[in-house]
Amino acid sequence: MYYAIDVSKWQGAVNWASVKAAGIRHAMLRAGYGNSAVDPQFKRNAAQCTALGVDWGCYWYSYAASPAQARQEARCCLQVIQGLKPTMPVAYDIEYEPCILALDNATRTAMVQAFLGEIEAAGYYGILYASKDFIQNKLNWRELTAYDVWCAQYGSACTCPLPYGIWQYSSSNPLGIPGYGTSLDCNRVYKDYPQIIQDAGLNGWIASRPDKPADTEDNSAPDASTKYQLVTIGPVSTGDAMTLMRLCEQLHLTNQGLYRSAWADKPAGTQTLTIGPVSSGDAWRIMRQCLALELTDHGLYRSQYVE
């Protein structure tokens, strides 16, 4: 677990050197809001975080009133972050705006799916930001189990009904970042997002190859050799193997002979899976399932580009 702050124009010109000196090396930055508004501090925040080695992601505050409008917000967000290569997720921030509260749960849920679907289709790691109350009472949350969650719930515990990777636990600066008194959002983060994102080749990064460290950036021009990945998973339980096989069936990989399993030497009764070569999009879908199964947390998901 590590800590992160989230900021927008309301924090003014953040002194990122001071933030880093206080021990904070991860941040979520507001990229913008609504149909096309860019946060006036975003470019500066992203540039300074990158220069100082502070891992950052971003969020887009929604004013959408339909799935189509949420999809357009996602496209605007993608335009704003194009070429910046964040190492933390890209979040859909849905809150209690009147235009959103006027909708029913089904429409709000479809908006989440539309925004995050657009983000993921572009090769970015998407995450839902909402309060625990909003998730539980304003969304059909059981339909959102495929997505990672950044949950806001202030207090000593998070009781979000969905598994979450980030918990916004306070808005009163309990981390004591200089210059913000008792007004700064603070978060506990439970996944190694920079490693996950760079290993999977998301957010504009090139997936790590066996002859390079996982965090090495490949600036070579893309070609046919960088379009497909070989995925190795395991050792995993038979139940997890069956879950992944069903996903591969849905992706039409099994009927092409691209899903292979073998019994592992140990632990007894476990399997090692080899999947591919598959497109980067399919590799991302497989990795997302592995995230849900908590396999990535134990280093059981590995991928590499193949010729």
Listing of model-derived features with the role each one plays in the protein:
Residues 78-92, 96-98, 139-163:
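Structural recognition of alpha->loop->beta junctions
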